[in-house]
Amino acid sequence: MYAIAFDLEIAELKKHYGEPYNGAYLEIGKELKAIGFEWTQGSVYLSNDNNLATVYRAISTLSKIDWFKSSVRDIRAFKVEDWSDFTAIVKGA
């Protein structure tokens, strides 16, 4: 599986997207979900498959959103080989 992680500059996001700016994150989530990514935490999304073409489609889609292009500080994609969820252990469940 692959992951996409990004960081948006809030001041730029407010300027180019508007208020409430957190709606931008919902829009990004919808776009990525349609391509095959699931939100994990923060601004990290995991693909449902092991295909770099899915990553390419996601990056291509995001690059067509003007307010995203103007607001993104950093965006990276990487391969995830092992993914372990320790939430239940930390919460004592």
UniProtKB/Swiss-Prot annotation:
GO molecular function, one term: RNA binding
Keywords: Hydrolase, Nuclease, Virulence
Keyword Hydrolase annotated: yes
TM segment ranges: none
Enzyme Commission code(s) on record: 3.1.-.-
One matching Pfam family: CRISPR_Cas2
InterPro entries linked to this entry: VapD, Virulence_VapD/CRISPR_Cas2
Record-linked Gene3D superfamilies: 3.30.70.240
Family statement: Belongs to the VapD ribonuclease family.
Function: Cleaves ssRNA, mostly between U:A.
Subunit text: Homodimer.
Protein name (record): Endoribonuclease VapD
Organism: Dichelobacter nodosus (Bacteroides nodosus)
Lineage, top ranks: Bacteria, Pseudomonadati, Pseudomonadota, Gammaproteobacteria, Cardiobacteriales
